[in-house]
UniProtKB/Swiss-Prot annotation:
Induction remark: Expression is controlled by forkhead box O FoxO1 transcription factor and circadian rhythms.
Subunit note: Forms homooligomers; homo-oligomerization is essential for the roles in membrane tethering and enhancement of SNARE-mediated fusion. Component of the PI3K (PI3KC3/PI3K-III/class III phosphatidylinositol 3-kinase) complex I (PI3KC3-C1) in which the core composed of the catalytic subunit PIK3C3, the regulatory subunit PIK3R4 and BECN1 is associated with ATG14. PI3KC3-C1 displays a V-shaped architecture with PIK3R4 serving as a bridge between PIK3C3 and the ATG14:BECN1 subcomplex. PI3KC3-C1 can associate with further regulatory subunits. Interacts with PIK3CB.
Tissue: Widely expressed.
Renumbered residue ranges of the record's region BATS: 413-492
Signal peptide: none
Protein name (record): Beclin 1-associated autophagy-related key regulator
Subcellular localization(s) per the UniProt record: Cytoplasm; Endoplasmic reticulum membrane; Preautophagosomal structure membrane; Cytoplasmic vesicle, Autophagosome membrane
Residue stretches in coiled coil: 70-180
Function: Required for both basal and inducible autophagy. Determines the localization of the autophagy-specific PI3-kinase complex PI3KC3-C1. Plays a role in autophagosome formation and MAP1LC3/LC3 conjugation to phosphatidylethanolamine. Promotes BECN1 translocation from the trans-Golgi network to autophagosomes. Enhances PIK3C3 activity in a BECN1-dependent manner. Essential for the autophagy-dependent phosphorylation of BECN1. Stimulates the phosphorylation of BECN1, but suppresses the phosphorylation of PIK3C3 by AMPK.
Pfam families per record: ATG14
Lineage of origin: Eukaryota, Metazoa, Chordata, Craniata, Vertebrata
Alphabetized GO MF terms: GTPase binding; phosphatidylinositol 3-kinase inhibitor activity; protein-membrane adaptor activity
Primary site of residence: cytoplasm
């Protein structure tokens, strides 16, 4: 602090050199150098090589000043002032810290306020968007409510309609059930009426009976006339005579040849086995023999008359039962003179097909039917023992029975008329086998055409042979049937 030249320089205290340490060094150096003058001795204050001006005690107590007079304040005073300045500095620092703490708190609050404002602004925007969304949702909710209300009211209407339809369906069900019962009763009453009419028809006008024949078996006759024929051959002939083709197979018929079936009387009958060879023989004989035939009991007349009556009966029964026949066959088909074998066979096949069709419609036991037994099948059809006679409704013809209906003699089917003047006209063709059987007679209001018996048809029934007794018989029978049928159906 003091120097001899008065040009001491103040240097800041180095680290580790505090006032106490400096005083201790000065005392030690003074004590050690008491009474010595060393050229290299340096002042502990100014660090210059000067003479010692103060004692160690003064240095230790801080009681020394500059000797050049520039500053009269002692070191100890400076030290006290320094401590006071430090205290003031600390106080100022505290005040500044206090002031800055308030500022810091203010800034923090400002930042908090700013952040809160920003958050509030964001929340406002979010709330605004939320309000818009809510408004849209509210509008959608109102629309959905209106739509739901409409759907609810519509559902109510549909429920009412459903209940109304259910009530209507119940009423219709009751009505249908009642109508079904009425229809069933009508069908039963109609079946009874049909049955009574058919039975009345077959009991008064067209009675069909079984007639026993007294003719001997040709096998027995041949065995008596031909002594060379063995017993095995006779048995084979007898077995062949009693065999008939039925439903695609050959079956034994015990009635074959022993009986015949008559219609309208015992004098008009058909062979039970469907053998019309007597008619064929008569036609061949008629071709060679000229002149009128005066024999009243000629088999050809009885066969043609029986087939004509059977045709009339089948057409009338089909009209009563309201059934369309699969084959078109006129009542006068068998009334012509000298029918060829081919034409007669074709007409008989149509008649048998119609009879079997009617038997299928009336649920006749098919085991009793044989395709070639015309009048026997017809007798089973109109028999009083037939349970389903007069029924209405759908039916089905078995395939094997259809095959049996189409069976004919191959020799007859392959023959051709040598005269060439016989052609199949449109009236002789089939009506068609593709017809669909309708389930109810309600849709079959149009009766079959062949049943319309007119006066012109009745005139066609009698053949042009005036001298033939069979022609007169058929003509009178046809006229009586026509008059009875007109009176029966009310067509006057």
């Amino acid at each position: 602090m003091a120097s001899p030249s008065g040009k001491g320089s103040w240097t800041p205290e180095a680290p580790g050199f505090g006032p106490r340490a400096l005083a201790r060094d000065l005392v030690d150096s003074v004590d050690d150098a008491e009474g010595l003058y060393v050229a290299v001795e340096r002042c502990p204050l100014c660090n210059t090589t000067r003479r010692r001006l103060t004692c160690a005690k003064c240095v230790q107590s801080g009681d020394f000043v500059y000797f050049d007079g520039r500053d009269r304040e002692r070191f100890i005073d400076k030290k006290e002032r320094l401590s006071q300045l430090k205290n003031k500095q600390e106080e100022f620092q505290k005040e500044v810290l206090k002031a800055m703490e308030g500022k810091r708190l203010t800034d923090q609050l400002r930042w908090k306020i700013m952040s809160c404002k920003m958050r509030i602004e964001q929340l406002k925007q979010t709330i605004c968007k939320g309000n818009e969304e809510m408004k849209k949702n509210s509008e959608g909710l109102l629309k959905n409510k209106e739509k739901n209300q409409k759907l609810y009211s519509r559902a109510q209407r549909h429920q009412e309609k459903k209940e109304k339809i259910q009530r209507h369906n119940r009423k219709l069900g009751d009505l249908v059930e009642k109508k079904t019962i009425d229809l069933k009763s009508h069908y039963e009453r109609l079946a009874r009426l049909r049955r009574s009419h058919i039975l009345e028809l077959t009991s008064i006008i067209f009675p069909i009976d079984e007639v026993k024949t007294s003719g001997r078996d040709p096998a027995d006759v041949s065995s008596e006339t031909d002594s060379a024929m063995t017993s095995s051959m006779v048995s084979k002939l007898a077995e062949a005579r009693r065999t008939t083709y039925l439903s695609g197979r050959w079956v034994c018929d015990d009635h074959n040849g022993d009986t015949s079936i008559s219609i309208t009387g015992p004098w008009i009958s058909l062979p039970n086995n469907g053998d019309y060879s007597a008619y064929y023989n008569w036609v061949e004989e008629k071709k060679t023999t000229q002149g009128p035939d005066m024999e009243h009991n000629n088999p050809a007349y009885t066969i043609s008359a029986a087939l004509g009556y059977a045709t009339q009966l089948v057409n009338i029964v089909s009209h009563i039962l309201d059934i369309n026949l699969p084959k078109k066959l006129c009542n006068s088909e068998f009334c012509g003179e000298n029918l060829s074998k081919q034409k007669l066979t074709r007409a008989v096949r149509k008649l048998n097909a119609n009879i079997l069709y009617l038997c299928s419609s009336q649920h006749v036991n098919l085991d009793q039917l044989q395709p070639l037994h015309t009048l026997r099948n017809l007798m089973h059809l109109v028999s009083p023992r037939s349970e389903h006679l007069g029924r209405s409704g759908p039916f089905e013809v078995r395939a094997d029975l259809e095959e049996s209906m189409e069976f004919v003699d191959p020799g007859v089917a392959g023959e051709s008329d040598a005269s060439g003047d016989e052609r199949v006209s449109d009236e002789e063709t089939d009506l068609g086998t593709d017809w669909e059987n309708l389930p109810s007679p309600r849709f079959c209001d149009i009766p079959s055409q062949p049943v319309e018996v007119s006066q012109s048809q009745s005139t066609q029934v009698s053949p042009p042979i005036a001298s033939s007794s069979a022609g007169g018989m058929i003509s009178s029978a046809a006229a009586s049937v026509t008059s009875w049928f007109k009176a029966y159906t009310g067509h006057r």
